């Protein structure tokens, strides 16, 4: 009898039990598609990419309104496959094409993203790609998605093994200076907060008043000068 791995079983299930509706993203690292279960009609997101799936596996038992539910996650020979909840809604990036958020709305979104990051950071994970394209607004809930660039913080590492993230949002340490930790996500969240308020990167125009002071502290070059945790940032918002 041939032994079937969890990874192979997941690929087989997606191939035979689901219809692919459309591709959301494709890159040299892999692809992300929306699939529909043939029997139930329920839609899911299916990811397959080169890289570690450890963060997705740690998220399997987690239920948080600001993170997608991970249904299955498997890894084999450096390849990861993930089946996750399909979050219905527009991305924050799409919303910002037509309008800015009010300060109250921006604060609410940022607090919810802090809650999502607190969950990730509590399990030792760093998202490393917090940006408007990776935030879906589902009703009144902001949902942080896409953990393909995420990694687990390791005490023994001096720097990140891969340079991942988005230029303009990635913290300086993500470019190999030293290992990124939860404060890298604080940096990215500060950039996001400024953009939803002003439409511009903080290097071009800083938000006014208290929110501007918060953005400035989030985006300090030295990690030790930023808010040290998502909870600390949440407390000042």
Predicted regions and their residues:
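Conserved activation segment of eukaryotic-like protein kinases, specifically the C-terminal portion
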Residues: 159-173
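ATP-binding glycine-rich loop module of kinase domains
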Residues: 19-58
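Catalytic-loop of the protein kinase fold
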Residues: 121-137
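Activation segment signature within eukaryotic-like protein kinase domains
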Residues: 109-110
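Conserved HRD-motif arginine in the catalytic loop of eukaryotic-like protein kinases
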Residues: 226
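Conserved short submotifs of the Hanks-type protein kinase catalytic core
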Residues: 77-91, 95
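Conserved HxN/HPN-centered segment at the entrance to the catalytic loop
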Residues: 63-72
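Conserved catalytic-loop aspartate of Hanks-type protein kinases
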Residues: 185
């Amino acid at each position: 009898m041939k032994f079937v791995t969890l990874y192979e079983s997941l690929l087989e299930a997606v191939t035979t039990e689901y219809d692919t509706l459309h591709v959301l993203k494709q890159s040299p690292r892999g692809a992300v598609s929306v699939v529909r279960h043939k029997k139930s009609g329920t839609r899911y997101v299916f990811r397959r990419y080169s890289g570690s799936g450890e963060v997705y596996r740690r998220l399997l038992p987690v239920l948080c309104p600001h993170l997608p539910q991970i249904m299955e996650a498997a890894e084999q020979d450096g390849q990861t496959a993930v089946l996750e909840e399909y979050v219905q809604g527009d991305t924050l990036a799409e919303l910002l094409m037509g309008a800015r958020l009010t300060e109250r709305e921006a604060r609410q979104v940022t607090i919810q993203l802090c809650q999502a990051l607190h969950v990730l950071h509590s399990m030792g994970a760093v998202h490393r790609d917090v940006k408007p394209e990776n935030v879906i607004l589902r009703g009144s809930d902001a949902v942080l998605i896409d953990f393909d660039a995420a990694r687990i913080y390791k005490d023994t590492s001096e720097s990140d093994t891969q340079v991942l993230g988005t230029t303009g949002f990635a913290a300086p340490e993500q470019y190999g200076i030293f290992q990124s930790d939860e404060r890298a996500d604080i940096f990215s969240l500060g950039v996001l907060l400024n953009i939803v308020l002003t439409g511009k990167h903080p290097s071009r125009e800083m938000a006014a008043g208290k929110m501007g002071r918060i953005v400035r502290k989030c985006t300090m070059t030295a990690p030790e000068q930023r808010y040290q945790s998502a909870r600390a940032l949440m407390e000042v918002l």
